[in-house]
């Protein structure tokens, strides 16, 4: 039976493996710390799905208050189901749990950024009722090599 629960720092190795499936580089050296930070943050939720003790999926949610509209929104930050466990309803279960959490927090919408190459994920989100929205623009704040900021 597939169940969901809040993640714990002990889930770090399995979550790191799932993030690798999303083409994120090795997260093993910091993932446990990041999980603990997210779990302590009041506007974050980290859910996992498991079956017979094996962690098969992860869903990271961020609740964002809004200024100009009454309802807040929930952003799916990371969402992955183990590639060998897909099409078993795990993603649908996690997304449904996430939606229930968002509604309980007063959110009136959910959003997800999904890379253009993830066509299977796009089909999943469309089936769950998501629609495309306006383009997002991003600015990297990573070190760009400018010497002026270094001490």
What are these regions, as identified by a protein language model?
Residues 18-22, 101, 124, 128:
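Alpha-helical interaction/dimerization surfaces of two-component signaling modules
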Residues 21-25, 88, 131:
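Residues at alpha-helix boundaries and the short loops/turns that link adjacent helices
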Residues 1-10, 143-151:
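Conserved N-terminal entry element of GNAT/NAT acetyltransferase domains
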Residues 92, 116-134, 139:
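Conserved active-site alpha-helix within GNAT-family acetyltransferase domains
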Residues 79-86:
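A short, internal acetyl-CoA/4′-phosphopantetheine-binding micro-motif in the GNAT/acyltransferase core
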Residues 87-100, 127:
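Conserved acetyl-CoA-binding loop-helix of GNAT-fold acetyltransferases
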Residues 95, 102-114:
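Conserved GNAT acetyl-CoA-binding A-motif
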Residues 9-71, 77, 97, 140-141:
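Acetyl-CoA-dependent GNAT
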């Amino acid at each position: 039976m597939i169940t969901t629960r809040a993640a714990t720092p002990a889930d770090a190795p399995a979550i790191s493996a799932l993030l690798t499936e999303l083409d994120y580089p090795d997260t093993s050296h910091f993932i446990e710390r990041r999980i603990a930070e997210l779990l302590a943050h009041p506007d974050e939720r980290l859910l996992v799905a498991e079956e017979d003790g094996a962690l098969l999926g992860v869903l990271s949610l961020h609740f964002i208050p809004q200024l100009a509209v009454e309802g807040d929104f929930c952003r799916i930050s990371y969402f992955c189901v183990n590639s060998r466990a897909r099409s078993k309803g795990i993603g649908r279960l996690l997304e449904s749990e996430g939606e229930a959490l968002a509604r309980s927090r007063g959110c009136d919408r959910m959003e997800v950024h999904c890379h253009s190459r993830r066509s299977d994920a796009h089909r999943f989100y469309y089936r769950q009722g998501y629609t495309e929205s306006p383009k997002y623009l991003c600015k990297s704040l990573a070190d760009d090599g400018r010497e002026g900021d270094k001490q």
